[in-house]
Regions:
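Periplasmic/extracellular, small/polar-rich flexible segments of pilin-like filament-forming proteins
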Residues: 49-153
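N-terminal single-pass transmembrane signal-anchor helix
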Residues: 1-32, 36, 40
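Membrane-proximal N-terminal amphipathic helix
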Residues: 26-55, 65
Length: 153
């Protein structure tokens, strides 16, 4: 009888721990993928500093086609109106495979000396910055790093 109780408890603990472990793995994959966006940040910032407009696509930013900018968890890095869209694929968990995380440039339009700041996912820009580009993030906030979540004031 005691053995059945122990086995039942182990089963319950395993059922509770498995989703938590999977969530942690997904968050780690997202965090591991984020540095790939650094490839595009400087070229986009350079275009802004020279033209006061954001590059409409990869080519205008001086980057290869989206499918050529990849890593273990990202299958494409797409620039659209200055925003960097990371499409998850390759070895990414099936929960985020095909999903997108967007990093958008934020600028102070009337103070061009202020450098571009990057806003991750559903986060909001600091005042008085203006976010450029559209947010295509479709990954649930629970999986995103805290800095990428849509926190309210």
């Amino acid at each position: 009888m005691e053995m059945l109780v122990v086995i039942s408890l182990i089963g319950i603990l395993a059922a509770i721990a498995t989703p938590s472990l999977m969530d942690r793995i997904i968050r780690q994959q997202i965090e591991a993928a984020l540095p790939l966006a650094d490839i595009a940040k400087k070229p986009i910032s350079d275009v802004w500093s020279k033209t006061k407009s954001m590059p409409p696509d990869n080519q205008s930013a001086g980057l290869p086609v989206p499918e050529k900018i990849v890593n273990n968890f990202i299958s494409a890095l797409t620039v659209k109106d200055g925003a960097i869209h990371l499409t998850f694929g390759n070895r990414a968990n099936k929960q985020i495979n095909g999903k997108v995380l967007t990093l958008r440039p934020a600028v102070v339009t009337d103070a061009p000396i202020v450098p571009v700041t990057w806003v991750c996912g559903n986060a909001i820009a600091p005042n008085p910055m203006t976010i450029m580009g559209e947010n295509s993030t479709n990954i649930p906030d629970a999986y995103l790093p805290i800095a990428c979540r849509g926190l309210t004031k």
